[in-house]
Amino acid sequence: MNVRDVMKSFHIQDTLNKKVWEEDKTLNKNVRKILLKVSQKFIKDWNIDKKVKIQDIRFTGSLAAYNWSKYSDIDLHIIVQYKDLNKDLNLVARFFTLMKAYWNIKHDIKIDGYEIEVYVEDVSEKHTATGLYSVLEDKWIKEPEPTDAVFDEDDVMTKSKYFFNLYNDILLKKYKEGKYSEVIQVIEKTKEKIRKMRSSGLARGGEFSTENLVFKVLRRTDLLGKMNDLITKSTDKKLSETKKM
């Protein structure tokens, strides 16, 4: 997928997505029903003894705004209070990250071609989203407004190319040379760098910050997926070497 082709998807639409939203900008009843069922199933799969109060179930991301495209997915956030589960909030966050990954491996649920991405979020986490809808309450928390998509295309291109070059010229080379530990280490550091970069961009410049758009380019061109695959392959190679010893 060409980077410039992906960037064309960042333009603003005239309306919210009509497959998801009604004319009065409320969530389509069937869509809401599916999202509630998906949430209930996901929560059930946690399989934890302690009863967790669900604070809210929220729909956010580009499909809850005017910058949706064919690349969009449905970001479904289940809001809980982490400290209700454990005082170690980092432990709780890691648990839910693993649950999300496990869920995505097991399930491939889509609504009109749009994949549902389920997340668990602490109630204290701040939102920078353009649009935020409570699926539980069936109302907008923050209703989006159409706005001009102003961003520095050249800057997005330059920063995106850095990560493509890192993957093609360094990571693949190290993998072919059998430097599997280095591959894993570099990718883990790179993923953390991308995560921090996106968070700071959203906080400072919102949806159309260079950092957030770079993240979208990396995701929509599947570079992030390729990095994850390379971690898996490198880990398998390391384990195979251990067995031979």
Where do the model's predicted regions map?
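Catalytic core of pol beta-like nucleotidyltransferases
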Residues: 4-72, 80-245
